Amino acid sequence: MKNMEYLGCEIMKLIESIPTCNLLEINLNKCILEISLNRVDVFNALNPEIIQELINIFSWAANNSAATANSLVSDSGEILPRIIILKGNGKHFCAGADINWMKDSGECTLEENQKDAKRLDELFYGIWSNPCFTVGLIKGVALGGGAGLVACLDHVIAMDGSKIAMSEIKLGILPAVIGPYVYKRLGSAQFRRLAMLGSRINTDEALRIGFIDEIAKDENDLSINCEKIISQILTSAPSAIEQAKFLCKTFDDWNENMKELRDYTLKTTSIMRGGKEGQEGLGAFIERRDPDWKIKDEE
């Protein structure tokens, strides 16, 4: 930091480093990054351009998050992102893949279609594995790839009347790229059923099977519920949130014996206890004060 200033280098402000987006609306407010899909005329359908913009912004958030930096602020003193809110402008969250793009894929080579599929998976994995806590605000429909976006998020609040569907089978294709993420969220039986039915489920059904986490009665309630979950997550240590995601992935991927898994959890617990956040959290508890990552309401 000091060396760069001595050499006359200008350090770019955090907000100035955000990737340029034409099909997304981006708002960074302190530690909260809000991303709004903004193809309202086509119900926020996914095409290659918006997919790439989503990849870029989620990658930027991962690289500049408080968890990645292991600090609440950057070297220049700017507050780093801890929470990402994903929503859609207009009446609908996301109607899935742009039908014209899908139709054009029939004229593409296998290699070109695989490249598109790989890019879509890069998006889903970038959301699912993001070190920030991700919140989805859903209204209208979340179909196909839109349902995939929902499945990748950590906490999903849907407005009453919203519909979710893995509708690919109605078009003679499969929910294969979104599959791993929906499968992890729903489990085998529900994924299998919905993948074959392809029909839309309402918010009550989505809540029952775990596709969403909360139902909001209207847009005002959607905002209120979002504020509540933000308040809760800001009492959690940011790097520990990232490690919780990694721990879950380790459990999902584990193919070894139970003894090795137990050894892994013991090692992880020991590392976290002795780490910066662990020491701050334990110290705060003993001293009966808030840990340094907790943001008070007035802030």
Residue ranges and their predicted role:
Residues K2-N89, Y125:
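Conserved CoA-thioester-binding segment of acyl-CoA-metabolizing enzymes
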Residues N63, V73-P81, K87-L123, A142:
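Glycine- (often His-adjacent) and acidic-residue-rich active-site loop
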Residues G96-A97, Q190-S199:
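Short helix- or helix-capping micro-motifs
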Residues F124-L171, R200-I201:
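Glycine-rich beta-to-alpha active-site loop
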Residues I157-S162, I212-D263, K276, W293-E299:
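C-terminal long alpha-helix characteristic of the crotonase
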Residues G179-A189:
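Hydrophobic, secondary-structure "cap" segments at the distal end of domains
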